[in-house]
Amino acid sequence: MALTKAELAEVLFDKYGVSKQDAKVLVEDFFEEIRVALERGEQVKLSGFGNFELRTKNQRPGRNPKTGEEIPISARRVVTFKPGQKFKSRVENAEPED
């Protein structure tokens, strides 16, 4: 099971009493701000949670798994996430729900 944006909006509705529409907008805007900051080349640091960063991966050699032929893997930008210490330890020590 995965936590979705709709479920996050539902939590805001249940916990804080904001309207369902406002909760949906808040969740969408939150993730949009993260995306825009990353597009501008900024790091996103969420205290107690972790850091998002846009990194550039250089071109590198690769191999076609079917033919074994060497092919270049083109340079690209990737989003990385590094969890914070508090977040990491809480998740590592959490008991999974059934």
From Swiss-Prot:
Judging by the UniProt lineage, the source's domain of life is: Bacteria
**Which Gene Ontology MF annotations are present?**
DNA binding; structural constituent of chromatin
One term under GO cellular component: cytosol
Q: Which residues cross the membrane?
A: none
Pfam families reported in the protein's UniProt record? Bac_DNA_binding (PF00216)
**InterPro entries given for it?**
Hist_DNA-bd (IPR000119), Histone-like_DNA-bd_CS (IPR020816), IHF-like_DNA-bd_dom_sf (IPR010992), IHF_alpha (IPR005684)
Coiled coil segments of this chain: none
**Entry keyword Transcription:** yes
User: Could you tell me which PROSITE patterns the record lists for this protein?
Assistant: HISTONE_LIKE (PS00045)
Its biological function? This protein is one of the two subunits of integration host factor, a specific DNA-binding protein that functions in genetic recombination as well as in transcriptional and translational control.
By its UniProt entry, which PANTHER family does this protein fall under?
DNA-BINDING PROTEIN HU, INTEGRATION HOST FACTOR SUBUNIT ALPHA
Name-wise, this protein is Integration host factor subunit alpha
Q: State the organism named in the record.
A: Idiomarina loihiensis (strain ATCC BAA-735 / DSM 15497 / L2-TR)
